[in-house]
Curated annotation (Swiss-Prot):
Purpose: Hydrolyzes ribosome-free peptidyl-tRNAs (with 1 or more amino acids incorporated), which drop off the ribosome during protein synthesis, or as a result of ribosome stalling.
HAMAP family with a match to the protein in the record: Pept_tRNA_hydro_bact
Protein name: Peptidyl-tRNA hydrolase
Enzyme class: hydrolase
Family: Belongs to the PTH family.
Chain positions of site Discriminates between blocked and unblocked aminoacyl-tRNA: N9
Cellular location(s): Cytoplasm
GO biological process: protein quality control for misfolded or incompletely synthesized proteins; rescue of stalled ribosome
This protein's UniProt keywords: Cytoplasm, Hydrolase, RNA-binding, tRNA-binding
Molecular functions (GO terms): peptidyl-tRNA hydrolase activity; tRNA binding
Swiss-Prot/TrEMBL site (Stabilizes the basic form of H active site to accept a proton) positions: D82
Cellular component, GO, one term: cytoplasm
Organism: Thermus thermophilus (strain ATCC 27634 / DSM 579 / HB8)
Amino acid sequence: MFLVVGQGNPGERYARTRHNLGFMVLDRLGLSFRPRGEALVAEAEGGLFLKPLTYYNLTGRAVAPLARFYKIPPERILVVHDEMDLPLGRIRFKAGGSAAGNRGVLSIEEALGTRAFHRLRLGIGKPPDPSRGAEYVLSPFREEELPVVERVLEAAKEAVWCWVREGLPPCAGRFNGLDLSLG
């Protein structure tokens, strides 16, 4: 059993924002999601896929109860989320480590009581004005960024299936060096 969590905010208002890349990746998987608790959940490949309805910064409220109920260990949880510390076009697997200011990841860490879960970090780059980070992550991608976003979503979809079927080490080796910003 495993759990893949796509980070994002519910509602049409946020659907195409940088903060919703995790939701966008899960949408690409072609699964049927149904409401369960504070999330939309799909089942496939012997595991669960979760789109929390709690809003980004409270994701742990949806993740922890499901992980506990199904007795899913942290190393079988993958959180797919946007990452300002990576440029747009880069994706990177990571096991554990600091939330680096990502409040959604911190919420999961606090709710699970551990940092040992895996992450698929999707680069969105830094805002032009560092003091406007919240506004930046809640903004839609610019038109000229959309081709790169499309490549990121396709690669991230493949990366999620890789993690599900093969685990972290081979997938990190395959995806961590990719530069999808180049056409």
